[in-house]
Design a protein with these regions (language model features):
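Beta-strand-turn-beta hairpins that frame and shape the catalytic cleft
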Residues: 2-10, 145-154, 177
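Cys-nucleophile CN-hydrolase/nitrilase-fold catalytic domain and related Cys-dependent amidase chemistry
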Residues: 21-22, 29-108, 114, 185-206
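Short beta-strand scaffold segments in enzyme catalytic cores
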Residues: 86-87, 101-104, 144-146, 227-229, ...
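Short, basic/aromatic-enriched C-terminal tail that caps enzymatic domains
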Residues: 248-250, 254-272
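CN hydrolase (nitrilase-like) catalytic-core segments centered on the catalytic cysteine
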Residues: 65-85, 152, 158-247
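Short polar catalytic/cofactor-binding loops
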Residues: 14-19
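Active-site catalytic loop in hydrolytic enzyme cores
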Residues: 93-173, 186-195, 258-265
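Short, acidic/polar
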Residues: 23-32, 162-168
Length: 272
């Protein structure tokens, strides 16, 4: 943990998750421990940290073992004394699909929030690359803003990033930090990743912590990487350019509040 009460250290974990649940959990735990040893206060994992490029049976098996995922995150949050935003992991849905769910834990290991991804990636990136998340993921219907360490986090996942109204809603609910665990494709990442993340930071005067998946997953899908930590002015404080790893940034916990007072654009909107 950082020494000053005015300072916090954010950490974003970049992973190359596979279709093997236990390997991914071991990898995530190692990165959280690495971040904790470096003094991190808030650690954010990427989307699909526990399972990536899985078959239907593998997804269902992982969802049925979600208690193992939750137990690991709770234990390492308590052991390391860090807040964990748990990227996303599959949980069982009532209709036989799974949810793409982010679980949030405080320093004591208590689960303080659950967010199910609302916007599902049903797109054709190219003639050769298309996705239909709604065929196996049930969408959530409730945004989540959760307060811990005296700060409010707005929890989002990947494709949510393209819907600015969600971030404005979370900002109006008090969020000063947006977490955006992601698994962007390489083409969309090259074209839009940095632009979208900086825009969400600037237009809401909020921190953005955006951990990402990177590389080729189980010989199938390829993801962009480039995990980022961005300040409320849109400046990139840290970026992970390579493979799996951890980035950290020390920040002034009151910076977003100070900037919102000095540059009160959020109070100037005309359309409701």
């Amino acid at each position: 943990m950082s020494d000053s009460n005015q300072k916090l250290i954010f950490a974003a974990v970049q992973m190359n998750s596979t279709a093997v649940l236990q390997e991914n959990l071991d990898c995530a735990r190692g990165f959280i421990e690495q971040a904790g040893a470096a003094g991190a206060d808030i650690v954010v994992l990427p989307e699909n940290f526990s399972l990536m490029s899985a078959t239907g049976p593998q997804r269902r098996d992982a969802a049925e073992r979600s208690d193992e995922v939750e137990a690991m995150l709770s234990r390492v949050a308590r052991d390391q004394g860090v807040v964990i935003v748990g990227g996303s992991t599959p949980l069982p849905a009532a209709d036989g699909r799974v949810t793409n769910t982010c679980l949030v834990f405080d320093r004591s290991g208590e689960r303080i929030g659950r967010y199910d991804k609302m916007h599902l990636f049903d797109v054709s990136v190219s003639a050769e690359e298309s996705y239909q998340e709604s065929s196996y993921i049930a969408p959530g219907n409730s945004p989540l803003a959760v307060t811990t360490e005296g700060l409010t986090l707005g929890i989002t996942i990947c494709y949510d990033l393209r819907f600015p109204e969600l971030y404005r809603y979370l900002g109006e609910a008090g969020a000063e930090i947006f977490t955006v665990p992601s698994a962007f494709t390489v083409p969309t990442g090259r074209a839009h990743w940095h632009t979208l993340l900086r825009a969400r930071a600037v237009e809401n005067l909020a921190w953005v912590i955006a951990p990402a998946q990177v590389g080729t997953h189980s010989g199938k899908r390829k993801t962009f990487g480039h995990s980022l930590i961005i300040d409320p002015w849109g400046d990139i404080l840290a970026e992970h350019m390579g493979g799996p790893g951890v980035i950290l940034a020390e920040v002034d916990r009151d910076r977003a509040r100070k900037m919102r007072r000095q540059f009160p654009a959020l109070q100037h909107k005309v359309l409701k």
